Amino acid sequence: MSGEDIVEIYTDGACSGNPGPGGWGVLMIYKDREKELCGGEQATTNNRMELMAAIQALEALKRDAHVRIHTDSNYVKDGITKWIHGWKKNGWKNAAKQPVKNAELWRRLEAAISTHQVSWHWVKGHSDHPENDRADALARQGMAPYLPSK
């Protein structure tokens, strides 16, 4: 499969305080087209926003696709590629037998990837990676309406 047949997705989440107001941002690239998405919530966590970025990106795809998701969140990458199998086997409990945090978002992410061929790639955050920097700016843009007025 050529690189032109792959949707490249860059995701990021941001939070002012943890918990606090937060936002998510997505940059999607397919061939010569780009699409930007962002949103936010009043009271959330950074991990929830990282998950929402990936979910929103995948849910925005109009047809089954080969997808490369680039994230600076090991929580998201490891959660969906490694930990989720054990969580499901253990009734959505973690290794300490506690309920998995953000289980509803993990289920939503799992459903969102089910029709796509997805590979997950970690990128170092805030390291002058242009596409990741754009996703970060979009996450901050998504968070902005929820920040207290100065």
UniProtKB/Swiss-Prot annotation:
Q: Which residues form the RNase H type-1 domain?
A: 3-144
Q: What is its main location?
A: cytoplasm
Which reaction is this enzyme known to catalyze?
A: Endonucleolytic cleavage to 5'-phosphomonoester
Please name the InterPro entries in this protein's record.
RNase_H, RNaseH-like_sf, RNaseH_domain, RNaseH_sf, RNaseHI
Q: Which CDD domains match?
A: RNase_HI_prokaryote_like
Binding sites annotated in the UniProt record for Mg(2+) 2: 12, 136
Gene Ontology biological process: DNA replication, removal of RNA primer
What the entry lists under Pfam families is as follows:
RNase_H (PF00075)
Q: Which domain of life is it from?
A: Bacteria
Which residues are Mg(2+) 1-binding? 12, 50, 72
Q: Which cofactor does it need?
A: Mg(2+)
Q: What is its EC number?
A: 3.1.26.4
Q: Please give an example of a GO cellular component term from this record.
A: cytoplasm
Q: Which GO terms describe its molecular function?
A: magnesium ion binding; nucleic acid binding; RNA-DNA hybrid ribonuclease activity
Q: How is the cofactor bound?
A: Binds 1 Mg(2+) ion per subunit. May bind a second metal ion at a regulatory site, or after substrate binding.
Q: How does it assemble?
A: Monomer.
The family annotation for this protein states:
Belongs to the RNase H family.
Q: Say what the protein does.
A: Endonuclease that specifically degrades the RNA of RNA-DNA hybrids.
Annotated protein name in UniProt: Ribonuclease H
Organism this protein belongs to: Parvibaculum lavamentivorans (strain DS-1 / DSM 13023 / NCIMB 13966)
| Encoding gene, per UniProt annotation | rnhA
